[in-house]
Curated annotation (Swiss-Prot):
Function: Component of the anaphase promoting complex/cyclosome (APC/C), a cell cycle-regulated E3 ubiquitin-protein ligase complex that controls progression through mitosis and the G1 phase of the cell cycle.
Protein name: Anaphase-promoting complex subunit 7
Pfam families documented for this protein: TPR_8
One GO term describing the cellular component: nucleus
Assigned keywords, A-Z: Cell cycle, Cell division, Mitosis, Nucleus, Repeat, TPR repeat, Ubl conjugation pathway
Species of provenance: Dictyostelium discoideum
Source organism superkingdom: Eukaryota
Length: 580
């Protein structure tokens, strides 16, 4: 005899589904939820439909099926509107649940829908749903989520961003993310924070040691990041060193310290490099700014080390943008540009507001002699973060395109943000040095920058290149030698070798190329320089040799693009005379 199924108890099934979701048993919840939502509507009340679709959406969200969960959250919201928000629907009063707070449930659904849109990179739609929740009805999570989205958008929403972060602090005075973000924006956090702390401690009925909130240690850290946002790395560095003296193995502090050294006027790449290595020793799977570290590894042509970092990041953080920009750098070093672009696009798809990914994409496209294609990426990077690194690449692109006015605007913008910063002065000098009629002014600015910081690598390289262009050969050598005495690097030896090569001092050039390779045997610019020098010493014109190779490649591929390549190469040659 075939056993009959018992009567379906929808309310009990929904209760079981809620237990599974709250226990984070999402696979089991999806399995049960499929049965709940498939019960015919005649056997369910509209209220039960609202709850079951919402819980089913929760189970799918927990399984990272964001597009599917979005569908069911919206379905739940649609039914909610039909039942509770339709004033003409008087016949359905029996379908309403008296003790059900439909407005609060509506806001919770809108928040869940916004999270789905964030996960699938539809941030504008996410913001529209969050903004439809009345301000007074927004909870801590809603305020924090919308503040993050406003922050990603940038200046256009800065006022709303500040208001949202302040509401977060009112609700939770220990939200360090909100405190840091507000201080980075230059806001007086204490006006909100102190009353919020007092209210919190009074609410908890005592001032005993378990309830006292201590944020005295965060002030210096927040201020250091504010100085970084203002392009004042020296001030940031001083503050971070004080924090680091108390928390010497704090990974976040070490990361910010490494970045401060990177942006600093003095040649601090070695300090940056060493701090990142310390972070890797403490935690090889730490993700913060690891793509910046990988860019330093690429710059030094350290392929094995770069590969190791990429493997660790892919294994531990496959859903982070930094992972895929790091992988893109690895392929860029291997000259696999197609793979490099593929991975940098993957990084952008994960986090569109990651400025380094846009900057790297622009750099890759510039390497392909495609400055017009590179320009939007570099402009987006500069829009997201106005710092010397994003400005330098954008200026370089404008110069290649012979857009002197645009290059000058970018250089002046970054220089106005930090007028006493040698690197920004060097960038402005570089733009002016590209215009023969402005070279005298460029020299004044670069000389002032060098006085401000005698060992700023950007200034030294820019001024030495200007000296070479104007025929001041010995001055170029002297300034580079002075830098070399201060800090011996593979870069500086290679630069000096290049200057000697322009004057046909082959023996001196060879000495410095070899010295660069002694410091770093994998340093690609030095290897290329030696290869070029060896051709010259054999009486072979290396440029003619390269042109011949390009002609052969064009004939093999049947592409008639040689004239354009030559024009692009000419642009790059002019640009390379100034750009460090």
């Amino acid at each position: 005899m075939i056993q009959q199924l018992p009567m379906v108890n929808v309310e009990l099934m929904i209760s079981n589904l809620r237990i599974l979701v709250e226990s984070k048993q999402f696979s089991s919840a999806e399995f049960l939820g499929n049965f709940v939502i498939s019960v015919p509507n005649q056997q369910k009340t509209p209220h039960q439909n609202i709850i079951s679709f919402s819980l089913f959406g929760d189970s799918l969200f927990g399984k990272n099926e964001f597009v599917r969960s979005l569908k069911y959250f919206k379905q739940s919201l649609d039914i909610l509107f039909k039942v509770y928000n339709n004033p003409n629907n008087n016949n359905n009063n029996n379908n309403k649940q008296a003790d059900f707070d439909n407005k609060q449930f509506e806001y919770e659904l809108k928040y869940k829908i916004s999270l789905c849109y964030i996960k699938i990179n539809r941030n504008n739609l996410a913001i529209s749903y969050l903004e439809s929740i009345p301000f007074s009805s927004r909870g801590l999570d809603t305020h924090l989520t919308i503040a993050r989205l406003y922050k990603d958008i940038g200046k256009e929403k800065s006022k709303e961003c500040i208001i949202s972060y302040k509401e977060v602090i009112k609700l939770c005075p220990l939200c360090l993310e909100a405190i840091n973000s507000l201080k980075e924006m230059g806001e007086n956090v204490d006006q909100v924070l102190i009353p919020s702390i007092n209210k919190f401690q009074q609410k908890n009925n005592s001032f005993n040691s378990n309830n006292i909130i201590d944020l005295s240690w965060i002030s210096l850290l927040s201020m250091s990041q504010y100085e970084m946002k203002r392009n004042q790395p020296e001030k940031s560095l001083i503050l971070l060193k004080k924090v680091e003296s108390k928390f010497s193995t704090n990974l976040y502090v070490l990361e910010k310290l490494a970045l401060s050294y990177l942006y600093h006027d003095e040649p601090s790449i070695i300090n940056t490099f060493n701090i990142f290595q310390k972070i890797r020793l403490l935690d090889p799977y730490y993700i913060g700014s690891m793509d910046i570290f990988c860019s330093l590894l690429k710059r030094r042509s350290l392929q094995f080390e770069l590969n190791k970092v990429c493997n660790d990041l892919v294994a531990s953080n496959p859903y982070c943008a930094e992972t895929w920009t790091s992988v893109a750098l690895f392929y860029f070093l291997k000259e696999n540009v197609e793979k490099s672009l593929e991975n940098v696009d993957r990084a952008i798809s994960i986090k569109e507001s990651h400025e380094f990914a846009h900057s790297l994409k622009g750099e890759i496209l510039l390497s392909l002699d495609e400055p017009r294609e590179a320009l939007p990426s570099l402009e987006r990077a500069f829009q997201l973060s106005k710092n010397i690194l994003t400005a330098r690449e954008l200026v370089r692109c404008h110069l290649i395109l012979n857009q002197m006015k645009e290059a000058l605007v970018v250089a002046e913008t970054i220089n106005n943000l930090s007028p006493d910063y040698s690197k920004t002065m060097a960038l402005l000098g570089m733009v002016l040095a590209n215009q023969p009629e402005e070279r005298e002014e460029a020299r004044k600015i670069l000389t002032k920058a060098l006085t401000l910081s005698p060992h700023c690598t950007d200034t030294v390289l820019t001024l030495s290149k200007l000296n070479v262009v104007e025929g001041r050969f010995q001055e170029a050598i002297d300034i580079l030698n002075s830098q070399l005495e201060y800090q011996e690097t593979d870069l500086m030896h290679t630069e000096i070798a290049g200057v000697y090569l322009t004057k046909d001092y082959h023996e001196d050039a060879m000495i410095h190329y070899n010295s660069a390779l002694e410091i770093n045997p994998q340093y690609e610019p030095a290897s290329r320089g030696i290869a070029r020098l060896e051709l010259i010493m054999k009486g072979i014109d290396p440029d003619q040799e390269l042109d011949q190779e390009n002609d052969d490649d064009d004939q093999e591929e049947g592409e008639g693009e040689n004239d354009q390549e030559e024009n692009d190469d000419d642009d790059n040659d002019d640009d390379d005379e100034y750009i460090s």
